[in-house]
């Protein structure tokens, strides 16, 4: 599915820490939601966004409202969509870093209630352009996201087919779950 059309309150965009949204979901966010890009550049310049410390942008309008052909026909069109800018790499030229992703997931686990996140959509962090493998990232993401007491969705990379055996409960959460 298309994460930007999810019904989740908070949508995650994987980013670097230097303020460049050149490819992938980040590039799409940059062009579809210019305010997100402006905020992203600001938090990069001010060093508020760094590996292990995502930045939550609490926008005041919904994605549904902005993407719909007939916004006035939408129920609940006044609900805001927030963006979680989640660093997966320091510089856009580099590969994503598993340790930084894990630290960011720990931040989400430790701060989602305080920040008011009520539901969360995430891409497969670092997979695709970040050059990490779902077999490594999937279980890590599921470990942390399963600890959240809110609805969560993970959107798999469109560029590569994830083998079915890597999508089982045993593969993602271990056999003791």
Name each model feature, range by range.
Residues 1-177:
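Macrodomain-like recognition of ADP-ribose-binding/processing modules
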């Amino acid at each position: 599915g298309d994460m930007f059309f999810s019904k989740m309150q908070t949508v995650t965009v994987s980013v670097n820490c230097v303020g460049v949204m050149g490819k992938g979901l980040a590039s799409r966010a940059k062009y579809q939601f210019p305010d997100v890009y402006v905020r992203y550049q600001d938090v990069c310049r001010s060093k508020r966004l760094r590996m292990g410390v995502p930045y939550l942008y609490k926008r005041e309008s919904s994605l549904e409202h902005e993407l719909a052909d007939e916004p006035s026909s939408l129920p609940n069109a006044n609900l805001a969509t927030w963006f979680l800018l989640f660093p997966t790499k320091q510089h856009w030229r580099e590969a994503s870093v598993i340790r930084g992703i894990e630290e960011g997931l720990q931040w989400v686990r430790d701060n989602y209630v305080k920040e008011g996140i009520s539901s969360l959509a995430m891409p497969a962090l670092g997979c695709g352009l970040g050059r990490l493998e779902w077999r490594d990232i999937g279980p890590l993401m599921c470990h942390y996201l399963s600890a959240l007491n809110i609805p969560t969705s993970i959107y798999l990379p469109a560029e590569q087919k994830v083998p079915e055996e890597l999508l089982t409960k045993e593969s993602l959460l271990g056999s003791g779950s």
